[in-house]
Amino acid sequence: MKLSLIVCLYNTPKSYFSECLHSIKNSTLKTEDYEILVIDDGSTENYSDVINEYGARVIKTENRGIFRARLLGIEEAQGDYISFVDSDDTVSFNYHFPMLLHAEENDLDVCFNDWAFHTERTRYSCFGDSSISKDFIYEGDAVLPAFLKNEGREHSYFVLWTKLFKASVLKGILADLKPIAESEERYNYSEDTLICFFAFKSSKKIANLHTGYYFYRIHSNQTVNIISEERLLSHIKFMSKTLDVMLENLPETDNQSEMEASIKKWAGLMSRTHYSHAKANKYSHLYDFIKDSYHVDTLKKSTFHDNSSYSKNKVLPVNILEIDTALLDLWNSETEDHVCLCEANKYMRRSVRFIKKQGKKIKVSPEGRKLPTPRVKLIDRIIMNKVVYSLGLIFFKKGSRIRAFLKKHI
């Protein structure tokens, strides 16, 4: 077994979960190369019909929280590599297979691929995120500093779902992670950051590529959405604990002080983020708790620079699923295909090149069959324009209800 795809599940809307597994199944991955491992963390919903439809392996547990669910998935995974897909998200048709190839061919411990937000009206990718806009390879003592250098500003580094990991790396850090997970009844925030930290600390070589998208869905049921004072307190408690654990477990290297400084700046970022949430939701009395949790002298609200990686966006076609279906048909075809790429975008051309490279018989010709024309609405281009989007970041306060509403619907 080459790859285990771990899907942790807890009362996710069934339609989202079905879309998640459907996207994995309808991809360039070969059936014999991977397993879908569902960790059902005590859901009250019955998902057996969806799980059976897509041939997933399921382990049911009592509700113990996402951290323990992820660790159980790592323990039970049978693949040489491991990747995570959240149960309400989806992936494009050519996401995991190229990562698997790249990792195998280059002996990577961690491989990144691109990602995009998926809202109710559109999908867009953040080109301010360096893992999307640049190519990189880090080796040896440069790996962990690469994880820390952005100080929490770039989504791709501190979440699990943008990456494929060598299974031996993740299984090797279970001894570090289990005591932390078991020290709390529910460690339900920033646990992915903690897993990534220990994984990068144990990795010798990491790199990225750009063949597809992980679609991170934004919706009202997400656990990361702050609704109550209780949830905000929980987020502060676990994020500050995560940063403290990272500080305590830095390796003794020549750049240790540099990494310490990065973690402290990350703490400053999170103190501003959570203070902004507190102010926007009338929880200003949490001032001292936030300040003490993040070990900062004073609290300030979020700055524009804190959100800079999200200000440069690229809107994806509204018909991206239709495009993916057509590209998957090319992948699955057993005959020679003549394809016209006259109106194809960069993503489509790159996908066709990848398919050809894998030995599929494709000839590019103006007379060939046309792939779907990418369609992007003018209003989406305007909304996601850097100037317009940046003004939105400035005028709509972080943590405010109107910003949460716009984030979900725009």
Predicted features, each with a name:
Residues 7, 12-27:
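Short, well-formed alpha-helical segments that are part of the catalytic scaffolds
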Residues 23, 37-48:
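A conserved acidic beta->alpha catalytic loop
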Residues 44-52, 90, 94:
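Acidic helix N-cap motif at the loop->helix transition within catalytic regions
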Residues 47, 61-77, 87:
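Glycine-rich, basic loop-to-helix element that forms the pyrophosphate-binding segment
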Residues 82:
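Short aromatic/hydrophobic "clamp" motif used to bind/position activated sugar donors
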Residues 90-190, 194-202, 206, 214-229:
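Donor-binding/catalytic cores of nucleotide-activated saccharide
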Residues 212-219, 226-254, 269-300:
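Catalytic core of nucleotide-sugar-dependent glycosyltransferases
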Residues 275-410:
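Membrane-interface aromatic/basic loop that binds lipid-linked glycans or pyrophosphate carriers
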